[in-house]
Amino acid sequence: MPWSVDFDAATGVVQSVFVGELSPAELMAALAATIEASRNNESRRVLADCSALTTGHSLVDLYDAAVAAAADPNTLPLREAVLVPTSAEAADLVSFWETAATNRGLQVRAFTDRAEALAWLTGARP
């Protein structure tokens, strides 16, 4: 499985990690698992580590995921920090996700630095 979802009790952040190729079905499964972990742990803060993501899904898949996330009452308000992948193609997909999700009312921001992403999520200053 190219993704995992865990809850970090120390920071109160749901952490989703993506590695390699992520199919459209895996993207939607990861989204559902992230929303469930957010609900179960009463956290609206998500760190999506896409730094090792390559590709596997399309802009349409991301658009559909943004629509689904915004339509789920368990996601609002949601604050998600996304660690940008090193792959240029995957980085473009993250940029699209940031725009599509933000346009639907989610707070999404892309980062290249994990510490900065966590600081934004938790309100801490690095």
Where in the sequence are the language-model features?
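Amphipathic, Lys/Arg-enriched alpha-helical "gate/interface" segment within cytosolic domains
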Residues: 1-126
